[in-house]
Design a protein with these regions (language model features):
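Phosphate- and other anionic-substrate recognition elements at nucleic-acid/protein interfaces
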Residues: 1-166
């Protein structure tokens, strides 16, 4: 059974992480990647994630399963970056666990908004576009995840770090 779990939330611009030992958070943060294009950021990620790996002790990596992307080009860039990140984080005996976003979000009590909750947002902010309401619900769900992190004694402002904690 895994006792040292590294939760990660990766993107083409950063990796957020939370290291849990025996279900208790011990180290967390976010590393930003720099570069004028995805390939420069991949190289930066390779160096920074290698350094991060040297400072962390884990036996399992928990990564959010990619569900959908807006374009094929974005999906390819994410695949390149995730490959670079995972290649640096993995040891020979590292277990990898992929978790669907709705599964971990539900586990921490951050389920999708119900019709009633969505209607409450519309009632509170009348006259907005559907896109505005969708974005507002997304923001509120991000805040729920940040609030969950606070229940563990972690003060974070980055929803990326909060996602890694979740």
């Amino acid at each position: 059974m895994a006792t040292k779990i590294l939760g990660i939330d990766a993107s083409t611009n950063s990796i957020a992480f939370c290291l849990m030992h025996d279900s208790k958070p011990v180290k967390w943060g976010e590393v930003i990647f720099h570069g004028s294009n995805v390939y420069e950021r991949i190289l930066d990620a390779k160096h920074k994630v290698h350094s991060l790996r040297e400072r962390l002790n884990y036996d399992t990596i928990c990564i959010e399963a990619a569900v959908s992307v807006k374009s094929v080009a974005t999906g390819l860039k994410m695949a390149y970056m995730f490959g670079a990140i995972m290649g640096e984080l993995m040891y020979d005996d590292t277990e990898i666990v992929e978790v669907h976003p709705l599964k971990w979000q539900g586990f921490i009590g951050n389920n999708n908004f119900t019709k009633a909750e969505k209607q409450a947002v519309k009632d509170e902010f009348p006259g907005k576009s559907e896109a505005w309401y969708k974005n507002k619900v997304r923001e509120l769900r991000k805040q729920r995840t940040i609030d969950f992190a606070k229940t563990l004694g972690i003060e974070v402002e980055s929803d990326n770090v909060a996602d890694a904690i979740g």
